[in-house]
Amino acid sequence: MSDLHNESIFITGGGSGLGLALVERFIEEGAQVATLELSAAKVASLRQRFGEHILAVEGNVTCYADYQRAVDQILTRSGKLDCFIGNAGIWDHNASLVNTPAETLETGFHELFNVNVLGYLLGAKACAPALIASEGSMIFTLSNAAWYPGGGGPLYTASKHAATGLIRQLAYELAPKVRVNGVGPCGMASDLRGPQALGQSETSIMQSLTPEKIAAILPLQFFPQPADFTGPYVMLTSRRNNRALSGVMINADAGLAIRGIRHVAAGLDL
């Protein structure tokens, strides 16, 4: 039996991309899974696909009341909460400082930070009492942009660096009761969108990047699927496999940190 059997897991943005992969993986592990999802159509799809195995709540991660409503439903259903995974986010399609008009930069900043940073903070606030009671954990989705430049424009990169500070501070504030960690995936096949303020709300990340471009820059030389990143979340959630890690950020970058100066990888001819 999985370590996560009957564990109560709350994931934001579970309707597509990495969020959907996490929903699938935790259900496979036998967990009781809930998600807060903005899209009514995706909520309906989740309910149709997973039935009683999913508690799908329509709501906005920038609204504390929506979080509280979801947590109340989780506690009614499961009687507890073991892990909160803050995952919902938006990207800026590499919108640069120089080429973005000042007024758009300002409104784009507020929209992107509301989702990528405030959304995490509000989720942590709503979930903290239940997680303190269960001595559970929080996990926040980062990005390679939390470590390196060029994984987005200044708005997205700054938001992911802000999230690393949030993880460290919450890990400090909530210890010893709650473990708080992060996972930073590299580019993958997803439907990640951008801020409406930048005119990117209908533009998917895969319209800016191709599988070939992503694979070419990664030393492991493959195009990751969302499911490729679910393992670290499972490990961090498990009390048996992770008793000792808090304030840790796993850089799941397919080897990007060891990319060579002369070649992307030295073993291409092996």
Curated annotation (Swiss-Prot):
Functional pathway: Aromatic compound metabolism; 3-phenylpropanoate degradation
EC assignment: 1.3.1.87
Pfam families: adh_short
Enzyme class: oxidoreductase
Catalyzed reactions per annotation: 3-(cis-5,6-dihydroxycyclohexa-1,3-dien-1-yl)propanoate + NAD(+) = 3-(2,3-dihydroxyphenyl)propanoate + NADH + H(+); (2E)-3-(cis-5,6-dihydroxycyclohexa-1,3-dien-1-yl)prop-2-enoate + NAD(+) = (2E)-3-(2,3-dihydroxyphenyl)prop-2-enoate + NADH + H(+)
Cited PANTHER family: 3-PHENYLPROPIONATE-DIHYDRODIOL_CINNAMIC ACID-DIHYDRODIOL DEHYDROGENASE, DEHYDROGENASE/REDUCTASE (SDR FAMILY) MEMBER 4
Name of the protein described by the UniProt record: 3-phenylpropionate-dihydrodiol/cinnamic acid-dihydrodiol dehydrogenase
Species: Escherichia coli (strain K12)
Phylogenetic placement of the source organism: Bacteria, Pseudomonadati, Pseudomonadota, Gammaproteobacteria, Enterobacterales
Gene: hcaB
